[in-house]
UniProtKB/Swiss-Prot annotation:
Gene for this chain: ndhD
Protein name per Swiss-Prot or TrEMBL: NAD(P)H-quinone oxidoreductase chain 4, chloroplastic
GO process terms (BP): ATP synthesis coupled electron transport
Principal location listed in the UniProt entry: plastid
Residue pairs linked by disulfide bridges in the UniProt entry: none
Source organism per UniProt: Lactuca sativa
Length: 500
């Protein structure tokens, strides 16, 4: 047990401090913005301090553990802890949420509620990544859905209510399977119902039962990741949501699905995972090709970026299915890498929309001349998205490739076939990325003539873009920033598998 409750403070602070926003004066937008940003900064500094001074990198076990009795009736505990798998997503959450609150500066309608919902979402996400009790994980998973639904339905495009309803139907449907899986695992292990992660990891289940649990958890995480064919909420949601909400969705929300797959499906249910992993591999390769070939057909800029997210999630799925140290490390690196790149692309798409008020790519063109800074940043992040060497996306995809090639589970021919199909997907990625840049920034359209209302990015937007760009370059140059966090934990997870 940790003496000082670092994690409880980190989880509770945003929603607790955020509740005071509702008492701030109604007209004081500036006060509300600064208050929210200060809370996010304080939270990020607290998290960084706790991890720098109280987290040992070479220890693969759970650290900063807090374990309090909550409900005696069925041994439900408030149990939090951090290990090498969850430290990356927690820091990513803090970083992206702080920048998303800065990106939400222009929001003036109901800004008190908007900023409170962002902070409530922050608490739910950090709680999901750090909970060590299955029911607590489920509660945090659900807590984070309510703010997202309200953010989607109240701020965004004309069809925002439709996309918010679609989002909540998909995710609530997935959550039913998650709850069934959590209760099944908790009740079937022994005479005493136990929802503790540590005891569940050491349980052995009959194979048929483990497969049923695996499918239940998989459906819940497949909606969130998203995995084909449960991905259709994503383009609609991203197409309509406000861009600061999009940053949180692309940067953190999707990563919760990948985190759940590794944390529960791989760690708790290793036998079922080794049975299903070839199918995951096939679905992952289909997803890369499908999304990369669907993306060029999208007229809406944000929908095109959303399909690129679906394509990148295929790499995470393949890394998880490879059951190798290298592949799983590559998947974790891709989780962090895409968190930065996806958030930045949606932010830049949103700031461009604020200026030119156009959504469809075929109506744009020639925007590079009046907005050179936005053009430069957009081009840079598009290159990062198509895995240009020297950027984080390239390292992550190469490590996933190596993970498949070195996997002991698959025969040579299937490995060659999967690698070949993935390579085709990597060729399709530049096609939609570069055509998006060409349609938006080049050519001759209305924006070649000087306009009073089309102006370049200001210091706030430039600060957000550069803040995200630095870690993308940093991880691309020196991936051990992220890999050193997870490498021991990955070895621990894979020690449960037979062939190594």
């Amino acid at each position: 047990m940790n003496k000082f409750p670092w994690l409880t403070i980190i989880v509770v602070l945003p929603i607790f401090a955020g509740s005071f926003i509702l008492f701030l004066p109604h007209k004081g937008n500036r006060v509300i913005r600064w208050y929210t940003i200060c809370i996010c900064m304080l939270e990020l500094l607290l998290t960084t301090y706790a991890f720098c001074y109280h987290f040992q990198l070479d220890d693969p076990l759970i650290q900063l553990v807090e374990d309090y009795k909550w409900i005696n009736f069925f041994d439900f505990r408030w149990k939090l802890g951090i290990d090498g798998l969850s430290i990356g997503p927690v820091l990513l959450t803090g970083f992206i949420t702080t920048l998303a609150t800065l990106a939400a500066w222009p929001v003036t309608r109901d800004s008190r509620l908007f900023h409170f919902l962002m902070l409530a979402m922050y608490s739910g996400q950090i709680g999901s990544f750090s909970s060590r009790d299955l029911l607590l994980f489920f509660i945090m998973w659900e807590l984070e859905l309510i703010p997202v639904y309200l953010l989607l339905s109240m701020w965004g495009g004309k069809k925002r209510l439709y996309s918010a309803t679609k989002f909540i139907l998909y995710t609530a449907g997935g959550s039913i399977f998650l709850l069934m899986g959590v209760l099944g695992v908790g009740l079937s292990g022994s005479n005493e119902p136990t929802l503790n992660f540590e005891t569940s990891v050491n349980q052995s289940y009959p194979v048929a039962l483990e497969i049923i649990f695996y499918i239940g958890f998989f459906i819940a995480f497949a909606v969130k990741l998203p995995i084909l064919p449960l991905h259709t909420w994503l383009p609609d949601t991203h197409g309509e949501a406000h861009y600061s909400t999009c940053m949180l969705l692309a940067g953190i929300l999707l990563k919760m699905g990948a985190y759940g797959l590794i944390r529960i499906n791989m760690e708790l249910l290793p036998h079922a995972h080794s049975i299903f992993s070839p199918w995951l591999m096939i679905v992952g390769t289909i997803q890369i090709i499908y999304a990369a070939s669907t993306s060029p057909g999208q007229r809406n800029l944000k929908k095109r970026i959303a399909y690129s997210s679906v394509s990148h999630m295929g790499f995470i799925l393949i890394g998880i299915a490879s059951i190798t140290d290298t592949g799983l490390n590559g998947a974790i690196l891709q989780i962090i890498s895409h968190g930065f790149i996806g958030a930045a692309l949606f932010f830049l798409a949103g700031t461009s929309y604020d200026r030119i008020r156009l959504v469809y790519l075929d109506q744009m063109g020639g925007v590079a001349i009046p907005m050179p800074k936005i053009f430069t940043m957009f081009s840079s992040f598009s290159m990062a998205s198509l895995a240009l060497p020297g950027m984080s996306g390239f390292v992550a995809e190469v490590i996933v490739f190596l993970g498949i090639i070195t996997s002991q589970k698959y025969l040579l021919m299937p490995k060659i076939a999967i690698t070949f199909v993935m390579a085709i997907g990597m060729i399709l990625t530049p096609i939609y990325s570069l055509s998006m840049l060409r349609q938006m920034f080049y050519g001759y359209k209305l924006f070649n003539t000087p306009n009073a209302y089309v102006f370049d990015s200001g210091p706030r937007e430039l600060f957000v873009s550069i803040s995200i760009f630095l870690p993308v370059i940093g991880i691309g140059m020196y991936p051990d920033f992220v890999l050193s966090l997870s490498v021991d934990k990955v070895e621990g997870i894979l020690s449960n598998y037979f062939y190594r």
